[in-house]
Amino acid sequence: DPDTIDWLEQNSGLPVIDHWWQTELGWPAIATCIGLGDRRRKRGSAGLAVPGYEFAILDDHGKPVAEGDSGNVVIRAPLAPGAFRTLWNNKAGYEKNFATFPGFYETGDAGYRDLDGFLHIMGRTDDIINVAGHRLSTGQMEQIVASQDGVAECAVIGADDPIKGMIPIAFVSARTGHDGDEALASRTVEAVRDELGALAALKKVYVVPQLPKTRSGKILRNLLRKIVNSEPFEIPPTIEDTSVPAAI
């Protein structure tokens, strides 16, 4: 989040050096490798590929996309030493990581590479929705929604649509004493439209008592997707409050 990094640098007087890694990799794969003499940083980027990792940005058909265009973040196989070589009791799951894009490890993240080679991670591919052929980051929308007065927590998900493929829907948990559900929803829709354009405009904002979360605080977005798409779902064993889905 560039705004958070800017705030931290301004208030601490120290540089914030970002990086990106996964448990499966055992080591940062995108970083600013100061020890190699390259101190370049770019706002909003995790950095450059660490030596030993070769990244590519591919579309859903496995074709490379142009610099600046978002796509699936993958790493050429074989992975560097220290990366995972199996998944415990889940050989099929391990193999699936390399099957979607033959010759590459599928990170499950979406992002893009800019003209200078810096890699920008937009979020999980599950959090990227395809609206009328355009890939939109729900994370960007959530930042705007969360910044609205009266919003305590939020989640933006993609609802199925017969014409556009998907449309963005927001679930909002309001703060005590906010200015009414309809006013809050209207302000939120307007704010997202103003900052991201009509294509990313929220189709609907649902103000709900609570959002479904795990006991560790992670919002169960997949559960919200199933609810809004009228799909059958099971209550996850990790959910914090089993009454929340019924209330939504």
Protein language model features and the residues they cover:
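Short, P/G- and charge-enriched loop/turn segments at secondary-structure junctions
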Residues: D38-S45, K96-A99
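Active-site glycine-centered loops adjacent to acidic/histidine catalytic or metal-binding residues
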Residues: W21, G47, D109, G133
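Hydrophobic alpha-helical segments, especially N-terminal targeting/anchoring helices
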Residues: L58-D59, T107, R113, K213
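Gly/Ser/Thr-rich phosphate-binding loop
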Residues: D1-R41, E54, H61-K63, W88
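Short proline/glycine- and acidic-rich turn/helix-capping motifs at secondary-structure junctions
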Residues: V205-R215
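Conserved ATP/PPi-binding loop(s) of AMP-dependent carboxylate-activating enzymes
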Residues: L48-G52, K63-N97, L136, E231-F233
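AMP-binding/adenylate-forming catalytic core of the ANL superfamily
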Residues: F55, I75, A80, G103, ...
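Short, charged, surface-exposed hinge/linker loops at domain edges
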Residues: P232-I248
